[in-house]
Amino acid sequence: AGSGFLSLCAHGRLSGLALEAGAAVSHVTAVRDGRALRGAGRRLPLAGEHLCRHLQRLLRERPAEPPAPPALGKKALTQLKEQYCYVSLDYEAELREEGCQPPARFQTPDGRWLTLGKERFCCPEPLFRPQLLQHSCPGLHQLAGQSLQALPEHLRRHLLGNIVLSGGSSMFPGFPERMCLELNSLFQGAGVQVEVLASPKRGTAAWTGGSMAASLTSFRHSWMTKDEYQEHGAHYVHVKF
């Protein structure tokens, strides 16, 4: 089954809007009664790996601080991103004020210390402003809006109250609140309160949902067997689901 549907399963839902921000790519998937609505799917070619590289650039380009050392590899950057970065609720205002959170200090593998200021909230901002990484596509919240606008009004209203976050790049502090603010702004005249569901374990929600779904006897008709895979190939998964 699609990872968007499985993320919904982890929250006990068969219908909803799944917003997945992972390592290599981010997705928006509208699901109704366990089926992904293909015309409403959206893709953002930007996720955690891009944010790590963005953080590296931010650290190297600081004029008033020593640049990040070459020893700051992918593992250290990922640790730095996950432990100290957050999503701002008002990016422009916080950028003017150099951040509302205190600076953080991080020791690199070679023993040097780095101080992080505005890099803490500038790192994940491209999820909402892809143009910061020279991408012309809309932000994840705007793609969610496009997906919802592609649906009939009654279904759109239902899904606005069932928005589920998943993936490691949705784990930034402030990410759920920012997403809720942005979507409420996009749909302020809809007369529906946007509800964004963010489990503390949402980083592995798709895996959890897959485990739950596979344990249900009612889901067995959707399994792709080894014989089917050998007969039809990997593309058959799109026929089954």
Summary of predicted features, one role per range:
Residues 1-241:
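C-terminal region/appendage detector
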